């Protein structure tokens, strides 16, 4: 069958150009040049169930390692200015049901939209200031506030940069509050 990476890449391509639901993925795929490039892809292989089957086999640790390998490869190959980074922490509310016990991220918390009745997920992102190249991200529970989380997120950011961030005094991090 198709690899987990293929499903991830296809979902990313679809979201970038013409987002459709997973149940409409085959119809979208047929309308693209991808069908000629990947003739082994079938209607059944692009069913929504196949997407969920493949995504459920990926854990956050594996995805984090893949992200880090990608970032490291780009930083090794490109001239990306790491002297300044921008940090943004945000949250977004979801419609995860109140009785859904499987969700560990979606929690009730404060958000600017005033939707405290809905579960939310928090997201932190570091990008290079000059090129807006994403360096690090973290997703965490919606009931954890930014002030508490910032210290942990910044330490994890520097840990992810590794030797590239030896002299933290040489990097300026810009954020709003």
Regions found by a protein language model. Give the residues of each.
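Dynamic "connector" segments at or just before major functional cores
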Residues: 1-108, 124-145, 151, 155, ...
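Phosphate/diphosphate-binding loops
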Residues: 163-177
């Amino acid at each position: 069958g198709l690899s987990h990476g293929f499903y991830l890449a296809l979902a990313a391509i679809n979201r970038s150009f013409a987002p459709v639901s997973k149940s409409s993925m085959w119809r979208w795929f047929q309308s693209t040049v991808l069908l000629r490039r990947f003739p082994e892809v079938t209607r059944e292989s692009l069913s929504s169930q196949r997407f969920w089957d493949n995504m459920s086999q990926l854990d956050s640790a594996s995805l984090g390692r893949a992200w880090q390998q990608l970032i490291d490869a780009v930083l090794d190959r490109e001239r990306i200015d790491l002297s300044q980074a921008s940090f943004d922490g945000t949250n977004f509310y979801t419609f995860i049901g109140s009785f859904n016990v499987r969700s560990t991220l979606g929690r009730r918390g404060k958000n600017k939209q005033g939707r405290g009745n809905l579960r939310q997920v928090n997201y932190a992102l570091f990008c290079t200031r000059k090129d807006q190249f994403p360096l690090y991200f973290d997703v965490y529970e919606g009931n954890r506030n930014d002030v508490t989380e910032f210290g942990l997120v910044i330490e994890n950011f520097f840990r992810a940069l590794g030797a590239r961030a030896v002299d933290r005094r040489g990097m300026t991090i810009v954020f709003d509050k």
